[in-house]
Design a protein with these regions (language model features):
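Positively charged n-region of N-terminal signal peptides that target proteins for export
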Residues: 1-4
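An acidic-aromatic
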Residues: 63-110, 176
Length: 209
């Protein structure tokens, strides 16, 4: 589930992945999202995640909040917390373990930093599925077959040029859909928000790096 959280951050952030075999219409839309996000100093949003098994069983909803400022981000969902100061990532599992990794170490994963830079021009192929109502739907498939998901369908609001929903299909044909709401693109976020403070976590927490 933590990988899904990272995708949420990535899609909400200044979009920059890189793709091969691109659809010009889809690229124009994604470029618009990228440019729009880069103009914001701080972004906050609420999210709802709904997961459905390959057999169609609804596994329930999860809700949380994300805050993003440039390369820094904070995600909270119940007791789970992921903090990044732009160089280091602290991932608290909500119990007694914090896993520490560097942004560089996450270079081969679907992390916000990778998605923050132009993922739709190298790491994905993508095409515009269609436009319905106020939304463009774009299908994105990873060029690396080792990724643990088959595709991501993103829904871009035509009026705001923001991604407000995404549907992820994994290798086991399970689906995870998340919806963003209450998006604030003019959030004043203090850098302290993205600073790791061990005192905020359980005294017996184990830190793995």
């Amino acid at each position: 589930m933590n990988k899904i959280y990272l995708i949420i951050l990535a899609l909400l952030s200044s979009f920059s992945l890189y793709a091969q075999g691109t659809d010009p219409q889809a690229k124009k839309i994604l470029d618009g999202v990228n440019g729009k996000m880069k103009s914001f100093k701080g972004v906050t949003a609420n999210f709802t995640i709904t997961s459905v098994s390959s057999k169609g069983r609804n596994n329930g909803n999860r809700t949380g909040k994300v805050s993003i400022k440039g390369q820094k981000y904070l995600l909270k969902q119940d007791k789970v917390e992921i903090i990044c100061d732009g160089q280091t990532i602290w991932n608290f599992d909500g119990a007694k373990t914090i896993t520490v990794s560097s942004v560089e170490e996450s270079g081969s994963t679907l992390s916000p930093q990778n998605l923050l830079s132009n993922f739709y021009d190298k790491d994905f192929t993508y095409r515009l599925i269609g436009t319905k109502g106020n939304f463009h739907e774009i299908e994105m498939k990873p060029t690396d077959a080792r990724k643990n998901f088959q595709r991501v369908n993103v829904f871009v609001d035509k009026n705001s040029s923001l991604i407000t929903k995404a549907r992820i299909l994994d290798k086991s044909n399970n689906t995870v859909e998340f919806t963003l709401s209450g998006i604030n693109t003019n959030a004043a976020l203090d850098d302290k928000l993205f600073t790791f403070n061990k005192a905020r976590f359980p005294k017996d927490v184990e830190i793995l790096d």
